[in-house]
Amino acid sequence: MGKHLVRCLPALLLAGALPLATQAATPAAASKQVQTAAAHAGMALGAADLKMAHAHLQHVVNCLVGPAGTGFDASAANPCKGMGQGAIVDAKGDAATEARLQQALQEAESGLKTTTLDDAHADAQKALSTLQTK
């Protein structure tokens, strides 16, 4: 029985350490994804046409919800690929940040429904301001 414990001990230690490592990386992962989402909200704000504004607003959504989230569009680029599970997912446990990111998500999604460049720019500005708020 002692031999089995010695063989399993490294795996048990690793299994116990993984959740701690994940928790430690979560705020940093969320922060990096928020910064990337804000950059794309800024790109949407500066877009010269509606198609480009919508493309960057979709990037904002993709960064916020992550690949498993509602609203994620796999056919659009995911500039946050490899950074985490989505800023909203990675911010779990921080109620104020979650609420702010949900608001930014609603603003970006609203921008995706616009039919004029001015309206898309207005929603991109709202999302950018929300994402830059601390």
Give short role names for the model-derived ranges.
Residues L18-A25:
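Sec/Tat signal peptide C-region and signal peptidase I cleavage site
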Residues M1-L12, G16:
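Bacterial N-terminal signal peptides that target proteins for export
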Residues A25-K134:
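Mature extracytoplasmic or organellar-lumen-exposed domains after removal of signal/transit peptides
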